[in-house]
Structure formats: structure tokens, C-alpha cells
Amino acid sequence: MVKAPAVVIKLDSITGLQSARILSGYGIPVIGIVDDPSHFCSRTNCCEEILAGSTTDDALLETLSDIAGRRGICALFPCSDESVRVLSRNRESLRERFRFVLPDEHVIDLFMNKINFYKFARDRGFAIPSTFFPARREDIDEIAGKMNPPYIVKPAEKTRRWIELFQKKVLKLGSIGELDRVFDACLDAAGDIIVQERIEGDDSRLYSCIFYYNSGCEQYITFTSRKLRQWRIEDGDACLAEECGDDEVLKQTIELIGSVKFRGLGSLEFKRDGTSGRYYMIEPNIGRPVTRIGLVEKAGVPILYAMYRDALGMSLPSDVMQRHTGVKWISIINDVLSAIAYYRKKQLTVREWLESLRGVKAFAVFSLRDPLPFIFQPFNYLRNYLGRPEPGPDERSHGGR
């Protein structure tokens, strides 16, 4: 029996690459859509086709229409927030020729917009960092009177303009004066912004629960893990992570997600305060895999395969329980960069770094069967570094990213 193809949208990302490899490993034909054909992840050999086209706007629909005309019914796997938004907006017209599992539009709005999410979590009694939603310059005075620096500033929703200007997902500001200096630029880049207190603790205090709720909105898979390091440090994506059991993370995730009618894939990140030990909800990711999706698969939990079968109306795999074997996952080059940064800050020794690599069994980019992405990764990074724009106002005051 011929299997329906899986279309990985935003293959040119570490998340997209891992998703394509995982699905291909189950014998599923994979088609990738990339914004950047020269990206190192676009060099993978695990796709039958790789098509160039926008994944961030409705131009994606033209590429999907071309695929459907040639390949018939396909299952869709968006691997970025922007592609989740495009599919959600056009879900009714797409359902004729594609199969996918996404939360309802109002649930996506609730979780993808951080202002909506933080208000929702706070109103239901969950702990979040002290948070402000400044819209006017006068609001800075209120922040100064109620919150001590450093301040974490982030957009309500990720925008291309924010990344172009600041070259990072969030800003860490050391004084109210710094916040005042970048305030207008932040509003211009994002529209709506969030200012939060920084929860004490290093990268290893960042925990998450990755979950899948089936098309009937029933809890089906949960998987808890934690970051050990991330790149960029303190505000980036995981580059070294490990499977771990954490009852509190699991409990709070189930309580929060259970309060809405949820279906599909998602994750919820927490930070455990280094002083009090209290868990704070940091952010959700919904409708798509996260960077460490390869860790879930290597630990024996077939979450993407379950999503594929669910989307196509097939029976779901039965063996989906987390085994808590302590598997570690690494993005090698990113972890080397992270380790160097921590070494320079005198927060990590070479010996400590080498010891932290024990137990690594899953790799984000490296693969003997699919070697080109790893080979081309450093060249892509060098190209991007040499082609970086002038730093934004925050970077001029902090020495760049």
C-alpha cells in the first residue's frame, strides 16, 4: 500500500530537518518546502522532493496546490509559527486535499500571542514571571516602580522586523534607562511587547512538556525533558537537552491544556526558580514540533508518527509511554558555540563540558546516513555572520549578540 506523503513546511530549519528524517524513517515519502534552498538543512537526502517557496504567507498555498495536483492527499507538518498561522487561516479550503491536526483558530490565537497566553495562565492561577504589557512611554515609570532589573523584553508575537533589528528572540536589559532607550524601537518592530522579570537560574532549569492531543481532543502523548544548554545562551533554542521525569511540569501542563479544547502538537516551557524552586510558565509552542523533537523520537515515543496516522484517520500507535531512560540530545555546532560563550564567562570548564556530553544518543543535525546538512552547517553560519546587518540599539549597548 502506497503511503500518503508528508509535507514538511519550513524544512530549512533544524526542527524541519529532524521532522523530515523522523517521518522518512517510518517509510513515509517526505516532501520539503523551504524558504532558503541554500540553507544547510535543505541539503538533506531524506526528501523525495524539496520545493522552494514562501512558508510565511499565503504564497504557501500555491506550492501546496502544486503538490496536491501531482501527489494527491498529503499530511501537513508545519515547522514554524508562521506556517501554522497560514494553515490555520486557510484550513477550510485546505481540507479537501490535505490532512492535518491543528488546534482551533481561537486556541492558536490564545497560545501564540504571548499577551493572551500570559493573561490566560495568570487568570487561572498558574505562576508566571512578573509581567507588564507597556503600550505607552508612561508605562515605563510603572515598571520602574514595581520591578527590578534585569528586564526581559519580548514581542507578543515573533516578527521578522524584530529579528532583523535585534538579532535575537528576546532582549535582556540591565536598567530602566536601557528599556527607555529601546522602547520605541521595540514597539516599532513588534507592535505589542512584554516586559518580564528574569527568573533566577541557568539554562538547566528550563523544563518542558511536549504533548500530543488526538483529533478528538484527548490527551495521548506527554514527554518531559529539560534543557542543559541553549544557543544563544539565556535566550535561544536548546542545543543540549535530556529526557527527565518531572511530575510538577507534567501536572501543570495537563491542567492548563485541559482547560481548553486542544488538538494536535504542542509544548509548554517552564523555568524553575534557582532560589525558591517554584515553577514559572515561560512560553508555549503549539501546532508544530520544537527544536528537540528528535529527543522524543530517540527516547522511543513516536509522536510525529502518531500525528501522521491521526491526520489520515488511521489507528494510532499504542506504545507511546515515556520510558524515562535519560536520553540526551545535542545540536553539536550550536552546543560548541554555547560552551565557548559559557567558558568565556567562566561558567563552564572544558572538563565540565565533556562530562555533560555523556549519554548523548540523539543528534539534531549530525547523521552518517544524511551527512550534508552537518557538513554545510558551519559554512551557512559563517555566511550569515559575515552578512549580518548593523546591530540594533540594544546590541550597541550590549556588545552584540
Where are these regions (language model features)?
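Conserved metal-phosphate-binding beta-hairpin within the catalytic cores
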Residues: G258-I293
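Gly/Ser/Thr-rich active-site loops/lids in small-molecule metabolic enzymes
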Residues: I176, V290-R309
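Phosphate-binding site of ATP-dependent enzymes
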Residues: L173-R232, E243-I254, K271-T275, Y279-Y280
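Active-site nucleotide/adenylate-binding loops and adjacent lid/helix of ATP-dependent enzymes
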Residues: I108-I194, S215-G216
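ATP-binding N-terminal substructure of ATP-dependent carboxylate-amine bond-forming enzymes
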Residues: M1-P103, E138-E142, G359-V360, F366-G399
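Glycine-rich phosphate/pyrophosphate-binding beta-alpha loops
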Residues: L228-R232, G236-L240, N285-A299
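Flexible, glycine/charged-enriched surface loops at secondary-structure junctions
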Residues: I194, R263-S267, P317-R323
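Peripheral (often C-terminal) accessory segments that flank ATP-dependent C-N-forming ligase machineries
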Residues: R309-R401
